[in-house]
């Protein structure tokens, strides 16, 4: 599948260059993940946006899209809870959960979805989004983040050791500001985010082979594919 997008400017996200999307990452749901920990120092725990496209296959375990953490009491994550058939978007600081959790039908629905979350500690606002639409309600209470980040993993919850994503993940972006998520979603068409303000991590997965993915944000923090995480031609 080939997705080609020409230059456009929608909702404040300027897609300045021709945009092709040939590959995504494919996770087996057993032990595949991507280590993005070189980028952990770029993430601002006081304010930020996470954005990614993902497609979940049938799974029998909890399936994290990503987890960024110091320890169990200080972490940021998006995870699908299999037994409850729910999605959880969580910012946890000093043991205080700021989270949105609600039922979801994404498992094995055959479709890519856009997932995003924004946090603004000083502004007292935490929001979650699926396909450009706010998911559940805005949360306003935060704990105080403690400690330096230990790891940033895609498709893996290292704190449990047994939770892995099964399916595809693509077009992963991190910002150190709150972004217009409807523009990131762009009516279901991934945007070229290179050059966007606040971009501190951007992994497009266009290598197609090998065991690393380049950071297109300009920060130079490549990701490492672990345990046979593969490339796929199935893209959003």
Predicted regions and their residues:
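Extracellular glycan-recognition modules
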Residues: 30-90, 122-126, 163, 176-184, ...
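Predominantly extracellular beta-rich ligand-binding scaffolds that present long acidic/polar faces
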Residues: 127-128, 136-153, 169-171, 175-181
